[in-house]
Amino acid sequence: MESKPLVTVITPTYNREQFLRQAIDSVLAQTMFDFELIVVDDGSTDNSWETLAEYKVKDNRIRTFWQPNQGQSVARNHALAEARGDYICFLDSDNYWPVDKLQQQLTVLEKNPTVDVVYGDIITIDKDGSETSRNNMTRYSGPIAKWMLRDNCVSMNTAIARRKCFDQMGGMSGQRRVADDYDLWLKFSASYQFLYVPAFWAYYRVMDDQISSDKTARFDSNEAIIHSFRKSYPNAVSAAEFNAGFAIFYVRKARYLASVGRKKEAFRVFFKALGYRPFGISVWRGIAAVTLR
């Protein structure tokens, strides 16, 4: 009987042939060997599937699946249904890991048995792999739901979670092509303990043509996600913390809209923020900053 791996690494891919080898190689190079790598090809039209076939022959820890194009949320759920590990983590096919990522995280989890999700920081790189930033956002530990309502502080490619989280609360919603990672970690934050470790655990590739379009779509998706979260988990935080989180989210969205020249929309979003926190200093500061710009 084939032994069960300790860790399952999940990689969805769609037309990322040029980066796929680097992602897979970074998993195979890990200093911790007890893992399986499940790659789901989401209907690629390049040579990704042929590349996967090469790797599968070389290493029996690699398992590959193909599906018609349905988005990475569905691809991740496909992999989750096949996963056998006690721990689950994700690596997108255009990103990669440092060689000791898994070993470091398993050591942290062993020392912290009450922690369910461990995550860290990213190094942002461009299409060619050159580093562009290490200026990471503020991240949090413990019950982090109130912080997650304001913004997603958990970087998908750096995180590792105990399998019980998925068994008890499920995987991706499968409803969105954008921000399925936020949906997952926000949901988990209603019940589980997170631990942030200030270590760079993933190289995250950002394409020039993705930045503005992805950010607009992500704000729209995140807005739907936080409202759905409040309906599904009304006791995750207090009413005051929900309102504060919503207000700060809307301030962030409004400031972004103003920064790309959509000032009228920005003011409409500021009014939404005022509805949740009419006397919030951050709301009024945001309004003043946009008005005077």
Please place each PLM-identified region on the residue numbering.
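Conserved nucleotide-sugar donor-binding catalytic segment
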Residues: 81, 120, 134-222, 261
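Conserved donor NDP-sugar-binding/catalytic core segment of glycosyltransferases
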Residues: 100-132
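A conserved acidic beta->alpha catalytic loop
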Residues: 26, 41-50, 70, 92
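C-terminal subregions of glycosyltransferases and related glycan-biosynthesis enzymes
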Residues: 206-293
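Short loop->beta transition adjacent to catalytic acidic/histidine clusters or analogous donor-positioning motifs
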Residues: 4-7, 28-39, 47, 60-63
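Glycine-rich, basic loop-to-helix element that forms the pyrophosphate-binding segment
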Residues: 67-83, 104
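N-proximal low-complexity "stem/linker" segments adjacent to membrane-targeting elements
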Residues: 1-28
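Short aromatic/hydrophobic "clamp" motif used to bind/position activated sugar donors
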Residues: 88
